Amino acid sequence: LLYGGEELDLEGETIKILHTPGHSHGSICIMCEESKACFTGDTIFDIDLGRTDLNCGSQKEMEDSIRNVISKWDNSITIYPGHDVSATMKQVRKYNTEYLAIMQGTGDGN
């Protein structure tokens, strides 16, 4: 199991485990710092966020994860979600209406 706050070294690549609850209480993102890549699972996608209406999902936790973790990522980071297409954070900040709504304080974008 991987837990938020863990750091791993994989042949010179620093891998950080980031706890990003919202889609589920145990959601994580896996940040590869040197490669500027983040595997986001079902937390964030190119144009929307993971569902929070399923068992163990929480809109408040998702909003906290966006504000306290994901919003701090550099525009050059490429996200690789669990499905759908990859995107840079620059693209996310332009096209992801749910992300933008949370950052602007207007809700979840729905």
Protein language model regions, located:
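Short acidic-hydrophobic, aromatic-tinged amphipathic segments that line or gate anion-handling sites
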Residues: L1-G4
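Metallo-beta-lactamase
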Residues: E7, T14-H19, S24-G109
